Structure formats: C-alpha cells, structure tokens
Amino acid sequence: MPELPEVETTRRGIAPYLVGKRICRVTVRTAKLRLPLQPDLDSILSGRIISAVERRGKYLLVRFTAGTLILHLGMTGNLRLVQADTPPGRHDHLDLVLNSGLCLRLTDPRRFSTIVWTHDDPLRHTLLAKHGPEPLTGDFSGDYLYTKSRGRRITVKQFIMDSRVLAGVGNIYACEALFRAGIHPETPAGALSTTHCLRLADTIKEVLTDAIASGGSTLGDFLVSEGKPGYFPMSFSVYGRNDAPCPGCGAPIRRSRQGGRSTYFCDRCQH
C-alpha cells in the first residue's frame, strides 16, 4: 500500500501538471472501486479549474474553487499523467482529461482505491476528520506520542500506524522507524518512556524524510506512457529482510505477524 512518502511524491509529481488546468471531461471505465464512484462525476468536474493538489496522511486532495476530490490509492493504485489519446489498459479505471492534452489516469489492479467528491471542507469529511497530526509538522513530537500512549495496551507498532494517532505511517516505515529507535515492535505503547517517545518521534521523521528524498529521482516518471514508479530505491534496514543479517549486530532479522501484517525487527537491537 502506498504510504505517506509515496503519496507525497505522487503529489509533487502531478501537481505542476494539474494546478491551473481545466477538466475537459471525466472518463469512468470502472465505477466499482472500494466505494462506488459517483455517477455524475463527469458533470460535476467538467469545466472546473484545479486550484491545488494537497496531501493529508495517505490521501490526496485535488482542490477546486468550490469543492475537493479526495483520493486514496488503496493497495495497488497509482496515478500517472499520459497523453489524453493513450489507449487505456485493463486496470485503467478513470481519466481526468485536462485542457493541456494530458490526462490524469488511475490504474488499480485490485480496485481498492477511493475517489470521493465533496463540496464541504475535506478535512471534516468522514474519511479524514479523525486523522491525527502530520508526522513531518510541528504538531507531532515525542511529547505528543508520550501523552497519547498513556494507558494504551496495543503494541507500539500498531499504535503509530493508527491514523487517529498519526497520519500516514504504514507498515514499511513503522518497521524502519522502530528499528532506528531501538524499540521492539511488540512493546506495549503504554510502556514507552519519555525518552523512548522522543527518540521514536525523531526516527519517524527521519525515515519519512529519507524516503521522500529517495523518491525525488522518480518525479519525472509521472509523465509516462506506460509503467509506474514503484517503492523508492531506499535501502531498508529490516523491512522485507527476514533472516538477512541485521546491519547493526549481524543477527538474523526476524519476522512476525501483527494485525495481519508482517513485522520485521532485530531481537538484539530492539528492546
């Protein structure tokens, strides 16, 4: 699933081609996504000019002067800019055709993407209203983590992946941040000390910043005729490295299951 860095890089990649452009038409090939697409999306959007492309957690917000298109890429979704006459593929479900001759195309093999139009404040929409702070802003800190974690029995990994606690941190970067902080992923959130929380807040910011920086070289890939950018060419310390040597101590990286997801960690370095 695209996490905060992937969504932020998508935003940075597409925004220069969208802002100030007018929607000429909307082509819907598959309305049955995670939430059914509104049947009148073409009549709603045609003629409107895009004023901004923003991000909230793992969601993209395509803003117009009177309304916002909220997008979530689900498990396998991606957005690409293609020439408007580019033939669609099997999993190309929606095109936003622009007056520049380009179109923003949604591709999603598993169809778990979400696209919702709202006239109201998108940050108050049910999809976003309960989101916690953005991890790369001043609203997020170790003190915040410490306060929110008091009395919580869930594991620290599940805690930092809860969008009500923190917006946008998914499985990959939770594993990496916990490794850098030296915190075992199965530690109860309520057992974290102030020092733990200060260190973890720092490593969450570091991991996300590094991932976004690694994605900088992929920005040009958003204007293509086929293919898509994958996860960043980042050298993960633990994620996906089951049984490989830990970069810190050489012990084998372990894998467990938490909340239906694989968790990667080092038993020696993380306590």
UniProtKB/Swiss-Prot annotation:
GO terms for molecular function: 8-oxo-7,8-dihydroguanine DNA N-glycosylase activity; class I DNA-(apurinic or apyrimidinic site) endonuclease activity; damaged DNA binding; zinc ion binding. InterPro entries: DNA_glyclase/AP_lyase_DNA-bd, DNA_glyclase_Znf_dom_DNA_BS, Formamido-pyr_DNA_Glyclase, FPG_cat, MutM-like_N-ter, Ribosomal_uS13-like_H2TH, Znf_DNA_glyclase/AP_lyase, Znf_FPG/IleRS. DNA binds at residues 91, 110, 152. A zinc finger (FPG-type) spans 237-271. Keywords: DNA damage, DNA repair, DNA-binding, Glycosidase, Hydrolase, Lyase, Metal-binding, Multifunctional enzyme, Zinc, Zinc-finger. GO terms for biological process: base-excision repair. It catalyses: Hydrolysis of DNA containing ring-opened 7-methylguanine residues, releasing 2,6-diamino-4-hydroxy-5-(N-methyl)formamidopyrimidine; 2'-deoxyribonucleotide-(2'-deoxyribose 5'-phosphate)-2'-deoxyribonucleotide-DNA = a 3'-end 2'-deoxyribonucleotide-(2,3-dehydro-2,3-deoxyribose 5'-phosphate)-DNA + a 5'-end 5'-phospho-2'-deoxyribonucleoside-DNA + H(+). Its EC number is 3.2.2.23, 4.2.99.18. Pfam families: Fapy_DNA_glyco, H2TH, zf-FPG_IleRS. It comes from the Bacteria. The active site is at residues 2-3, 58, 261. Its cofactor is Zn(2+). Binds 1 zinc ion per subunit. CDD domains: EcFpg-like_N. Monomer. Belongs to the FPG family. NCBIfam families: fpg, PRK01103.1. Involved in base excision repair of DNA damaged by oxidation or by mutagenic agents. Acts as a DNA glycosylase that recognizes and removes damaged bases. Has a preference for oxidized purines, such as 7,8-dihydro-8-oxoguanine (8-oxoG). Has AP (apurinic/apyrimidinic) lyase activity and introduces nicks in the DNA strand. Cleaves the DNA backbone by beta-delta elimination to generate a single-strand break at the site of the removed base with both 3'- and 5'-phosphates. This is Formamidopyrimidine-DNA glycosylase. The lineage of its organism: Bacteria, Pseudomonadati, Thermodesulfobacteriota, Desulfuromonadia, Geobacterales. The gene is mutM.
